[in-house]
Amino acid sequence: MCGITGFFTTSPGQIQNRRSPIEVINEMCSTIKHRGPDQNGIFYDQSHRLFLGHQRLSILDLSDNGSQPMTSHCGRFSIVFNGEIYNFQEIKDSLTRQKHMNWRGSSDTEVLLELIAEVGLAAALIKLNGMFAFALYDNLLDKLFLGRDRFGEKPLYVYSTGVEFAFGSELRAIEKFTDNLSINPNAVNA
């Protein structure tokens, strides 16, 4: 079990209550530390509008090569990932044969990231067998994508106001971003 969290804001200077974004993402990560006590990491874009946080429980790749957030070899994509891809070795072998990949480590996260870089997000998701939740930042398009497995086994909570967006493996992480949480009844009915 790992923990993921992050946020996007249109006003990068300060978050609610006049806190710095670095302070906020660190607080968000600390609330989910029990999900991944081995290591934590943060990523933010050049404009300081997007922040990704990860709490790591090392299982597949115990080295620092499995650290997250992780950025693709091409530099276009950055990801925080929680879960397991059961068929990652098959996908890794296929990418190695086709593209002669030089892998940094042995994590399923790196395999997912490079698969997305190679075939695109939609095509990559079709190939996956596993349980997972992730946030993927596309640096070229300046877009954030959230994804979960078909059955939603791994938790992923979201908060959105139109100018601010936050997510986390637990609501506690989002509570560090805002004091203004409420349930959207239409989303619950979906």
Question: Where are the regions a protein language model picked out?
Answer:
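Cysteine-centered catalytic environments shared across enzyme families
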Residues: 1-190
